[in-house]
Amino acid sequence: MGPRLGVWLLLLLAALLLHEESSRAAAKGGCAGSGCGKCDCHGVKGQKGERGLPGLQGVIGFPGMQGPEGPQGPPGQKGDTGEPGLPGTKGTRGPSGVPGYPGNPGLPGIPGQDGPPGPPGIPGCNGTKGERGPVGPPGLPGFAGNPGPPGLPGMKGDPGEILGHIPGTLLKGERGYPGQPGAPGSPGLPGLQGPVGPPGFTGPPGPPGPPGPPGEKGQMGLSFQGPKGEKGDQGVSGPPGLPGQAQVITKGDTAMRGEKGQKGEPGFPGLPGFGEKGEPGKPGPRGKPGKDGEKGEKGSPGFPGDSGYPGQPGQDGLKGEKGEAGPPGLPGTVIGTGPLGEKGEPGYPGGPGAKGETGPKGFPGIPGQPGPPGFPTPGLIGAPGFPGDRGEKGEPGLPGVSLPGPSGRDGLPGPPGPPGPPGQPGHTNGIVECQPGPPGDQGPPGIPGQPGLTGEVGEKGQKGDSCLVCDTAELRGPPGPQGPPGEIGFPGQPGAKGDRGLPGRDGLEGLPGPQGAPGLMGQPGAKGEPGEIYFDIRLKGDKGDPGFPGQPGMPGRAGSPGRDGQPGLPGPRGSPGSVGLKGERGPPGGVGFPGSRGDIGPPGPPGFGPIGPIGDKGQIGFPGTPGAPGQPGPKGEAGKVVPLPGPPGAEGLPGSPGFQGPQGDRGFPGSPGRPGLPGEKGAIGQPGIGFPGPPGPKGVDGLPGDAGPPGNPGRQGFNGLPGNPGPPGQKGEPGVGLPGLKGLPGIPGIPGTPGEKGNVGGPGIPGEHGAIGPPGLQGLRGDPGPPGFQGPKGAPGVPGIGPPGAMGPPGGQGPPGSSGPPGVKGEKGFPGFPGLDMPGPKGDKGSQGLPGLTGQSGLPGLPGQQGTPGQPGIPGPKGEMGVMGTPGQPGSPGPAGVPGLPGAKGDHGFPGSSGPRGDPGFKGDKGDVGLPGKPGSMDKVDMGSMKGEKGDQGEKGQTGPTGDKGSRGDPGTPGVPGKDGQAGHPGQPGPKGDPGVSGIPGAPGLPGPKGSAGGMGLPGMPGPKGVAGIPGPQGIPGLPGDKGAKGEKGQAGLPGIGIPGRPGDKGDQGLAGFPGSPGEKGEKGSTGIPGMPGSPGPKGSPGSVGYPGSPGLPGEKGDKGLPGLDGIPGIKGEAGLPGKPGPTGPAGQKGEPGSDGIPGSVGEKGESGLPGRGFPGFPGSKGDKGSKGDVGFPGLSGSPGIPGSKGEQGFMGPPGPQGQPGLPGTPGHAVEGPKGDRGPQGQPGLPGRPGPMGPPGLPGLEGLKGERGNPGWPGTPGAPGPKGDPGFQGMPGIGGSPGITGAKGDVGPPGVPGFHGQKGAPGLQGVKGDQGDQGFPGTKGLPGPPGPPGPFSIIKGEPGLPGPEGPAGLKGLQGPPGPKGQQGVTGSVGLPGPPGEPGFDGAPGQKGETGPFGPPGPRGFPGPPGPDGLPGSMGPPGTPSVDHGFLVTRHSQTTDDPQCPPGTKILYHGYSLLYVQGNERAHGQDLGTAGSCLRKFSTMPFLFCNINNVCNFASRNDYSYWLSTPEPMPMSMAPITGENIRPFISRCAVCEAPAMVMAVHSQTIQIPQCPTGWSSLWIGYSFVMHTSAGAEGSGQALASPGSCLEEFRSAPFIECHGRGTCNYYANAYSFWLATIERSEMFKKPTPSTLKAGELRTHVSRCQVCMRRT
């Protein structure tokens, strides 16, 4: 234990020393430099004070730099269960789920689209016989027939005459001419039947026959619903019926109501009715089920289904291994102060912290004890600092004391003097607090700054009151007393353009000469160069000569709106204005008669009407009175600084007239000129009426009018403007005058403007020394003179009382001065608050201290040797004026100085005495032109005597100046009509017209196309039972019928005599007994003797007869029954032909065809059975249900499979055609299937073709019992099978081998009950088994193999009652682990264990954590002050500041990519998306965020999806809106497509900034300033909102940079559509912040409309600012 304690003591001592050393360094560092001023901050460090109160919570600081990676902390405790996490990403697709339960049958679907044409239907019935057609045209004549048979002999004719016959000779006569045709013979016998001729043309249909008698009821046919036929044409109306005959009916007695007659014959068809179409009927009953349809083709794969319901929560996974430590996270943002945690373990020692902010000033501490004196070490003189800020204006100094004396020349600056002795330290008032010094004197004016940007247009000023009666001559007062010299003024306004004098050289300064004689008159000089510019508002230059006309200038840009000018003089009446807009409709006025023209009335008071239209240019008005000074003009060019004005010089000689110069700029209005010569009287003008209108356009020059008659003499006019100077007249005779009397001295005049610089005079004669004048006022500082020659070294002067000189070079060390008296002891300060435990960081430099009391002067030191010159010191402040020294001796005359300003004009001298009158001289030569005389006074002088005689004819003068514009001429003749103009652009659409009158109803339309077939209706309700028909005639006896169907079960017969019957059916299940308590396990028993067989149980009572069930599946073949009693003899069969001896007999007779059963639901395809019968396997676990396989080709007939589960309802298929009758199949074994659930009614399918004869199948497994189904619909009757041919008579056969057992015969009548059978033999004794343990219930096994065929029972029994509880199954598999349980209650502390064995020595441990602070040690002795440390080496460059991911988006509103503002980095460029509109709803983007800058452009940048997993793109009327460029829209206003869209879409840039960005808005036309600490990124206009199609749109947050667009446009965006077009539309509006005057804040806004050119005068300006980092 000892060594370890020693180590701890050493560590503690080192820590204390380190702590003391750092405290001392901190104390010393407080006041070591020279920057502490006069504060002495040394002192002994006081004891550690009490801990202060906790301060207020500070504001959240800026995010710090990313620190270095910290050490890995210990693993934390297990946390509480967290909040549920965000939904994870979508997992991989799971296996198909178990099929759900069949849903309820759906509602009937919407009728589908028309299917393809079906197969040809069954031929329809013969149509009715048509009516007889019209008679056809006669046929062509037939061919000639064959010769007929010879006719009968004719009657005997008369004897003929023989002409020219010699009797006795027989002469043969000539052949006679053919005779006439004989009469037709009688018809011959009919000939043999000829061959069948070709079919003739279809004859016309005959008339309808009478209705036949009702036929016999036919067999029930197969009904197929054919397609609905088209609606037939309307038939021709029939002939009118016969008129009825009127009969007289006598009213008889009331008859009794007769019996209901028999149903009459069907009537003839009636005429078509005229009823309206009825309402749709109610749905009928359900129709009969159709046949199964054909198998459809395999469908295309379906779309992915909707997500299933969430599954059950999975089991908890195993706990994973501990992960590696992640990288340190970014510093989090403090959202709120959490609850105080428990005190943590002491951390590792931290690095030195950064310098903290300067803390608040503490209360003054207790004064420390004085420290030892420091060693004075003079510091190096620093380089000159930058000029300080301009100080405030100092107080005016005291007037200087002056002794008279001549002023000597300025001497050269002497060499720097030795430094003075050091002063005594100043006394403090006890509170060591540095106060700022007094304000310094005013510094010299700074360098002029860069010219500022052009300012915004000023706001319109208030209208000024006009000064109606102002005489400016009377307003000017007498001159005031001389004021003190003013500050140097700003440059004045530019003066009128003066003549420029030639610059003279600087001459030597001459002595004043005596008064010279007046010189001769010189020649007029040439026109001078322009002179220096000066400005005096009291002087106005003469009007310049008119110039040559200049070239027409280029058209200027549209200027900003100017300020309102002074009201002009009233103009003459203007021409009528242009047609105004259509006003509101006024009330109708009465028609007045035109009045006669009245006299011109006196001028009325000024009206307050609207500003009239622009009038023609008026004639020149009378000169106005001088106006009040105007508003300051625009900022002029920088003026040249000129000397202050001197007194006016003597008037110069007049120059000769120059050439006509160019026209000068328009001058400022001149002051009124001297009175001119009396002008001719002017005509009296018409008095003006109304306020002056704006100047009208320049009218066309009129034709010169005819000369008018001379006017009446007018009244005397006002003085005219001064005339232009005329050419010089001829030289007059010299006048003779007397000198006038001495005038009184005049009132001092207003100071004149400085005269022009005079010519250099020659050197004058030196004057006598004047008397010493009084001291003059301080003159302005002259320019520096040239350096003088080095004078001899003067004797040392009396020490002046002046300001301290510049710091000289350091002198050698002088002897130490005597100590000054101690300072006044300060008052005791307030006790300070206890300080913190550790020394704080070095504070900032304190403010300047109060000056201490001046110490007594020390003894002067010995003069030091000349030191090396020091660096120039900081210039000292300007000293106060010193006391004047005694006058020195006059110096030798210096070189000529710069000529002084011209002196003020001297007073008039006294007049000299008049001389005697001389003799008259000879007439001299004609003299030169004399100086112009002073203007004569016009007081009390007779104007008549002043007029001279008429002079000689003058020479022709030079061309006079251009005259003023003439007055308006008479109107000219009308011009030629102009050519037709081009057609204008279409106008705006007119207003909506009134609704028109209803039109005449149109003619009926053509019949519409055939409608599509309606959906299959539900079957109708059954119709009412028809009336019994008339009994038909007696039919012929029928053939013997087929064997009848099995009859109903007859009543029980009397007991028969016969063999005892079989045991009865199994009785009903008895009720289950109560479970017994389990017995104890018995001993193994010994083998018992075989028991007796039990007696058969009693027969159960017969159940009540149930409803007839639906036919079940055929049962298994029953055991061969005992021979029954003899049956009734059958009907005699037909005799067969004798047959040959047959082989082994075939299977029994073909059964009767059964009636169609209800179509069952289709079972799933069964697996092929195993051959043979195996041993039963172990029960397997229940497998998952497999997915349904594709439909295969039809296989061979398999063995019957397990009945399938209940299928879902299929869709209704079309009825299939009737199949051929199949071949008889072989008898198979049947299993009694379960009773199936009632399936939904399916469509009848096509009957399959007969398959090949399959082998007999194995007996099937017993199916699961289904739920009881509802009774099905009755099936349609099947078609009767064909009757077989009768066989031949067979020979008696040989005894054949026994045939296969025939099919089960019909059930015979019940037999007589039998006797009891004999007792069977006892069975063999079984082996005794071991008793097994009780197992857990097992899982349900697969169904076992089929048992042996059971006896066939006719009626399936009802289900029995539940049996007794079976034995327990085997132990099941282990279940999955259960869910995590709730956290248990903390257990109690266990008992301590036994002590363990002592372990081996452990490895040395790691360095322990910092222990708690020890108690403070005793106070140490003060150490000596340490020396100053060396300056540290330059630190490494700091890490660059991290951008904190502040994003800002800038839009150029042009096709150029914008630049990111300074201080930000580009991330990417894109296209400026403003908002999108889908499904008539808009969603906007904030233009200041990155979402408004899409990397790619499309007129339809989005698609839309629905819940059916279907998405559509560019398929309907959706829009997108983009910021646009100034590209003008095409003149055709057609939509823009393709590449032509590119110039219309604005580009944008997404930039990353190092700090927050926001927008500020001024709500004026001035650009707002960024807040303190923020810098500007760009300026713009305040954009708030936008809408377009359907009045939908969005807006910008005013704090976002997106609300400050750099360009103002009334249509800043363009609309694009999914069909690939873009355009501007009239329903697009943009909304901007307006300007608001402070005085208009809570008043009703004044409505106004701004036209193009003045839109920006009411839009607020804005600036986007970024916080400085």
Swiss-Prot record:
The modification 3-hydroxyproline is found at P204, P207, P210, P587, P602, P605, P647, P1214, P1424. Residues 347-356, 586-595, 758-767, 797-817, 1011-1020, 1290-1299 have a biased composition (Gly residues). There is a cross-link at M1533 (S-Lysyl-methionine sulfilimine (Met-Lys) (interchain with K-1651)). Residues 254-263, 289-298, 497-508, 535-545, 937-955 have a biased composition (Basic and acidic residues). Residues 173-1440 are annotated as: Triple-helical region. Its main location: secreted. Residues 50-1445 are annotated as: Disordered. Residues 28-172 form a propeptide. Keywords: Basement membrane, Collagen, Disulfide bond, Extracellular matrix, Hydroxylation, Repeat, Secreted, Signal. It is found in: Secreted, Extracellular space, Extracellular matrix, Basement membrane. Lysines at the third position of the tripeptide repeating unit (G-X-Y) are hydroxylated in all cases. The modified lysines can be O-glycosylated. Residues 196-214, 367-376, 413-424, 436-448, 1247-1258, 1413-1428 have a biased composition (Pro residues). Residues 1445-1669 form the Collagen IV NC1 domain. It holds the Pfam family C4. Disulfide bonds join C1460-C1551, C1493-C1548, C1505-C1511, C1570-C1665, C1604-C1662, C1616-C1622. Type IV collagen is the major structural component of glomerular basement membranes (GBM), forming a 'chicken-wire' meshwork together with laminins, proteoglycans and entactin/nidogen. Arresten, comprising the C-terminal NC1 domain, inhibits angiogenesis and tumor formation. The C-terminal half is found to possess the anti-angiogenic activity. Specifically inhibits endothelial cell proliferation, migration and tube formation. Belongs to the type IV collagen family. Alpha chains of type IV collagen have a non-collagenous domain (NC1) at their C-terminus, frequent interruptions of the G-X-Y repeats in the long central triple-helical domain (which may cause flexibility in the triple helix), and a short N-terminal triple-helical 7S domain. NC1 domain mediates hexamerization of alpha chains of type IV collagen. This is Collagen alpha-1(IV) chain. It comes from Bos taurus (Bovine). The gene is COL4A1.
